[in-house]
């Protein structure tokens, strides 16, 4: 057993313009090769495009999109005997948000289009409306969990 104390849990910082933790989480996930200023530019341009498309508060669209994509349950591979089962497990809110952001960014990267801010804004607007690739991914995960409900006791 370790003699060291437990590490303090870091709190998520908020971004400088919108003072929002979700925006900062999005920036940190979109970040590539340490280019944080570029990540901020992409996010802020995407937020402006959302404002132009929907003519509503872009942060509420972002919140709605993330809430719509956040999964309640997921499957985890668990080896029992000689076979591997997909065991459904519940997901906490922090992990769910992280998964939702990852799925939204993955779906927007796969989208055809000019640049990342255009694709990200389109994906966020679609997710807020209840369509798009990220929503499909969440529904697929829920279907997998429902199909493997019989293995829930392996937790």
Swiss-Prot record:
It is found in: Plastid, Chloroplast. CDD domains: uS7_Chloroplast. GO terms for molecular function: rRNA binding; structural constituent of ribosome. GO terms for cellular component: chloroplast; small ribosomal subunit. GO terms for biological process: translation. It comes from the Eukaryota. Gene3D superfamilies: Ribosomal protein S7 domain. It holds the Pfam family Ribosomal_S7. Keywords: Chloroplast, Plastid, Ribonucleoprotein, Ribosomal protein, RNA-binding, rRNA-binding. Its main location: plastid. The keyword Repeat does not apply. Belongs to the universal ribosomal protein uS7 family. One of the primary rRNA binding proteins, it binds directly to 16S rRNA where it nucleates assembly of the head domain of the 30S subunit. Part of the 30S ribosomal subunit. This is Small ribosomal subunit protein uS7cz/uS7cy. The gene is rps7-A.
């Amino acid at each position: 057993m370790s003699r060291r104390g437990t590490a303090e849990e870091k709190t998520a910082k908020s971004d400088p313009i919108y003072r929002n933790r979700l925006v900062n989480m999005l920036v940190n996930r979109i970040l590539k090769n340490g280019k944080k200023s570029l990540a901020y530019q992409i996010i802020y341009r995407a937020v402006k495009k959302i404002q132009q498309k929907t003519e509503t508060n872009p942060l509420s669209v972002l919140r709605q999109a993330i809430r719509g994509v956040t999964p309640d349950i997921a499957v985890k591979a668990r080896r029992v005997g000689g076979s591997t089962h997909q065991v459904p497990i519940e997901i906490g809110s922090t992990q769910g948000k992280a998964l939702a952001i990852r799925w939204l960014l993955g779906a927007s990267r796969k989208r055809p289009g000019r640049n990342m801010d255009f694709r990200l804004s389109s994906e966020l607007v679609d997710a807020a409306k209840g369509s798009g690739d990220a929503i499909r991914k969440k529904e697929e995960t829920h279907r997998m969990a429902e199909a493997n409900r019989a293995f829930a006791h392996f937790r």
